[in-house]
């Protein structure tokens, strides 16, 4: 009998500080002990599924009630939900493409840092030592507000018990995608320049009509940063894609190969309704945004294990902070003329 078959599963395994359920299982039943065995490609959680004969996908996929055929196996169901939600988060791969750093913390309060390089006047530079400018790194005064993103179940166990696990997993995966898009909206809102950041906005030469020259102005405005991501709402993205320069063969090949829209400048196009019409947010993804996350995907495991699904919730706690303001610029090509004027 393999050691994984003797582990006593308890719901308290979900409440270990700073560790997920699978991490706790791995400490009890390390995967490295299974090298050279038929289970070497399974992690500790997957070995528990195998132990109880629970098949979560493919031919012969089990139904939800299989998890609840024994008290120990019921403990595995919250992790099943969590993994499906994580797949949905990963399927929406936009956040990683606009985030420079993803920081994990244990608490709910986080204070960011900022840096400023001292300026110099070339005419007053004297000896060689004065060529080295100081960089002042300070802690910001205000805390980053982390927000909880989640969903509350309204379905009962009886409504789900005879449903195939692969179908139920798709439902939770879609929940994960929804949460990811909500996070994307707040990330973009964080990136948008505030009212005091007037130097972050570049007005187009011909208001109301987007030209390729305007995109070049945005590219130049971001220097010395690189505009590798452009964010706009759906109508504005249509304007960008309508430019003759967007008929570039390389851009077309990139879209067919990856599913990602890119400009001839090499910048990825991201659609977000948080950006006003006829405005384009250009960022350098390597310097613009920090994502702060407290813990992982949280499932109300005690309620799920007790089959009280209609009262259970899933959530994750995340916040965003702009790192370098200079790595974010806005192109505005909105017409200022008034109707009838």
Where are these regions (language model features)?
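Sequence/fold signature of self-assembling virion shell proteins
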Residues: 2, 246-341
């Amino acid at each position: 009998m393999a050691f994984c078959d003797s582990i006593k599963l308890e719901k308290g395994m979900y409440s270990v500080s700073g560790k997920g359920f699978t991490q706790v299982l791995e400490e009890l039943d390390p995967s490295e002990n299974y090298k050279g065995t038929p289970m070497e490609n399974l992690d500790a959680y997957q070995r528990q599924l195998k132990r109880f004969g629970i098949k979560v996908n493919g031919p012969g996929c089990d139904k939800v009630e299989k998890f609840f055929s024994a008290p120990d196996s019921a403990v595995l169901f919250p992790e099943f939900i969590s993994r499906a939600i994580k797949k949905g988060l990963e399927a929406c791969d936009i956040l990683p493409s606009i985030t420079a750093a993803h920081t994990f913390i244990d608490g709910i309060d986080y204070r960011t840092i900022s840096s400023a390089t001292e300026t110099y006047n070339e005419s007053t530079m004297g000896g060689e030592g004065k060529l080295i400018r100081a960089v002042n790194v300070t802690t910001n005064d205000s805390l980053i507000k982390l927000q909880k993103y989640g969903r509350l179940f309204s379905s009962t166990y009886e409504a789900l018990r005879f449903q195939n696990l692969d179908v139920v997993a798709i439902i939770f995966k879609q929940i994960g995608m929804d949460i990811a898009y909500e996070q994307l909206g707040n990330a973009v809102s964080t990136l948008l320049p505030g009212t005091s950041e007037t130097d972050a906005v570049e007005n187009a030469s011909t208001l109301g009509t987007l030209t390729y020259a305007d995109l070049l102005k945005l590219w130049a405005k971001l220097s010395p940063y690189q505009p590798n991501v452009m964010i706009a709402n759906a109508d504005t993205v249509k304007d960008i894609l309508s430019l003759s320069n967007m008929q570039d063969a390389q851009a077309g090949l990139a879209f067919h190969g990856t599913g990602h829209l890119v400009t001839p400048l090499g910048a990825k196009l991201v659609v977000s309704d948080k950006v006003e019409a006829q405005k384009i947010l250009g960022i350098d993804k390597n310097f613009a945004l920090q994502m702060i996350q407290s813990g992982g995907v949280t499932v109300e495991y005690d309620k799920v294990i007790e089959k009280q699904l209609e009262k259970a919730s899933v959530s994750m706690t995340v916040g965003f902070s702009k790192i370098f303001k200079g790595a974010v610029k806005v192109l505005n090509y909105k017409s200022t003329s008034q109707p009838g004027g």
